[in-house]
């Protein structure tokens, strides 16, 4: 009986400490998180395009190749592929997928014990969007919590379709191509549709 009481006392202390720690972390990080409403009308950076008299592209200047598109212009199979590879439960969570997060934490503990390195990131589409819009890409512990807080704010203020549209237009695909349309033109020389 004493062992059980001791276990319950330790568990209550641990849970209270965790709650106080998370509350303190929230109070510290929340003022650093931008307001999610600023992303409703985000301006997508497009390069300067020089066209010839015949209308063909001669040159492109700028750090990013971006061609903004609407969600209606994106083929459904591409949307399905993004959701299935990046965030299977995209329509079921509110910015943070706690199932994937807990699985990733267990995987991380296992990887640290066996010294295999770090596991996957457990980032949802909304968290990836938050990272690509607001935070630098350095791997820091606090950045992940900032992503989570901003993802929660984004999910409160934007619809899932608005989030997907921003993600499909802003995610880097390599070779300076930002967004799915720019990636299709960069890698395949044609439009998404």
Where does each model-flagged region fall?
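Juxtamembrane regions of bacterial inner-membrane/periplasmic proteins
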Residues: 1-193
